[in-house]
Amino acid sequence: MRSDTIKKGVERTPHRALIKGTGVPQSQMDKPFIGVATSFTDLIPGHVGMRDLERFIEKGIHSGGGYAFFFGIPGVCDGISMGHKGMHYSLPTRELIADMVESVAEAHRLDGLVLLTNCDKITPGMLMAAARLNIPSIVVTAGPMMAGRGTEGRRYSFVTDTFEAMARYKAGVIDERELGVCEDNACPGMGSCQGLFTANTMAILTETMGMSLPRCGTALAVSALKRRIAFASGEKIVDLVRNDITPRQILTRDAFENAIRVDLALGGSSNTVLHLLAIAREAGVDLPLETFDTLAKETPQISSMNPAGEYFMEDLDAGGGVMGVLRQLGSLVRDNPTVMGLSTLQLASTVESVDERVIRPLSNPVKKEGGIAVLFGNLAPKGAVVKQSGVSDAMMTFEGTARCFDSEEAAMAALMGGRIVAGDVVVIRYEGPKGGPGMREMLAPTATLMGLGLGDSVALITDGRFSGGTRGPCIGHISPEAAEGGPIALVEEGDRILLDIPNRRLELLVDEAVLQERRARWTAPEPKIKTGWLARYAKVVTSAYTGAVTSAD
């Protein structure tokens, strides 16, 4: 075992003394040492229930014959950090989390890992660490929140209802009482936000790839099932250690293709593009951005999930969950190992029934193509991403007038000031991985667009990214980003921009000679943040095209 490095031999007497100083008895020293990386915090609804799950994981590890050690990992809530300086830190924490898990596991020679996670950047950070370390690992996602409840059977979704309610209130569509009802009911308790936003999409994809146990991706945070899954995961990690089952045996090219297909079939968050690219890089799997678009043309969307549709995570779980989706996808799914021990197709075959109102058959899709499309053109030579499942038919093709803003705050001021009108294309730039820095989510501007009733007449493009709660004609991840001199930096007020999702085009309708002249006089702006962790991050982070990973190259 790896832990023998710190447990065996006379020269390890000091190491054993320190371990015994934590209370570990001699009788437990020959057992596998299992690290439980927990992202518990009482700052985030998605993580506030983890203390209970920690207990069940620990019981499972001891039942399976291992010895559990806990160590802490930070958690940032994208909802709380949205719309202010805090959002600069969200995506960078993914890299911090991966580095922290690696550091603790290597420094203490842990034999295996249980990765307790839930919210947006924490799950991909944990998976990046697992793939990088390649020691036996299993993921436990803490589960989604129940839908909020209102009068007359109304169900609330935190992301769509609260952010869009803010814009509707500002526009005079709803009053202060209705706004308050939304605020008080949108988050009824613990769990990740209720729709198919980034946290829940990543939980689903983690199960799809085989890195968590069946039902883990959809079982509600409040459920007894989630606790049983936590216990079983604790038992299972000891088995994985004894049989030397490692993440790279599971995180194969087939696993990533399955994850992308499930993402497309459900209309999941566009952030998964960044995260799957980053995880694949750590796993040594070649996964070009174009893969998402290739598979989107072959994979129909078969579920109408919130935010763009009517169903919540509790509906998906009851309707068949991840394995139900895999069963409906049928021959599109590739067989692959899982931490459970059964293969992907074996697990899918155990599903007895699927609620076809929630998870439709391939013969009756919601849309003929999957939920994410990748666009190219002179505005995005290295690609841009759109969640096409959230775009109305009227906006799949659109030509409009550029309204240029060099920050999210400037764009929000224009939106709330009534300066954006039908026919505009809102351009938010210098918000990419380097330029932001941190590639902030533009949920506030996109929710404001929808709340103001402009979702069918105004488009938004950015080198930043979007929340999983974003819907509407919103194009993100534009690469190269403005801070690197990408074409989005050359757009000027009044330019015409063409968005053509069916033909995968994003074009700036300006002569090349004019663009060359603009490029010749372009100079990079001063960094927005010059000190601290983010200043260092901006120097080593790469393009959205490669997953916005950090690199020393």
Curated annotation (Swiss-Prot):
Binding positions for Mg(2+) per the UniProt entry: 78, 120-121, 441
Transmembrane segments: none
Active-site annotation: 467 (proton acceptor)
Keywords from the named record: 2Fe-2S, Amino-acid biosynthesis, Branched-chain amino acid biosynthesis, Iron, Iron-sulfur, Lyase, Magnesium, Metal-binding
Pathway annotation: Amino-acid biosynthesis; L-isoleucine biosynthesis; L-isoleucine from 2-oxobutanoate: step 3/4; Amino-acid biosynthesis; L-valine biosynthesis; L-valine from pyruvate: step 3/4
Reported cofactor(s): [2Fe-2S] cluster; Mg(2+)
GO MF annotation: an example: 2 iron, 2 sulfur cluster binding
Domain of life: Bacteria
EC number: 4.2.1.9
Gene3D superfamilies tied to this protein: IlvD/EDD C-terminal domain-like
Pfam families listed in its UniProt record: ILV_EDD_C, ILVD_EDD_N
UniProt GO cellular component terms: cytosol
PROSITE patterns in the cross-refs: ILVD_EDD_1, ILVD_EDD_2
Modified residues (N6-carboxylysine): 121
GO process terms (BP): isoleucine biosynthetic process; L-valine biosynthetic process
Note on how the cofactor is bound: Binds 1 [2Fe-2S] cluster per subunit. This cluster acts as a Lewis acid cofactor.
Catalysed reactions, as listed in the record: (2R)-2,3-dihydroxy-3-methylbutanoate = 3-methyl-2-oxobutanoate + H2O; (2R,3R)-2,3-dihydroxy-3-methylpentanoate = (S)-3-methyl-2-oxopentanoate + H2O
Record-linked HAMAP family: IlvD
Primary role: Functions in the biosynthesis of branched-chain amino acids. Catalyzes the dehydration of (2R,3R)-2,3-dihydroxy-3-methylpentanoate (2,3-dihydroxy-3-methylvalerate) into 2-oxo-3-methylpentanoate (2-oxo-3-methylvalerate) and of (2R)-2,3-dihydroxy-3-methylbutanoate (2,3-dihydroxyisovalerate) into 2-oxo-3-methylbutanoate (2-oxoisovalerate), the penultimate precursor to L-isoleucine and L-valine, respectively.
Subunit composition and interactions: Homodimer.
Family label: Belongs to the IlvD/Edd family.
Name listed for the protein in its UniProt record: Dihydroxy-acid dehydratase
Annotated gene: ilvD
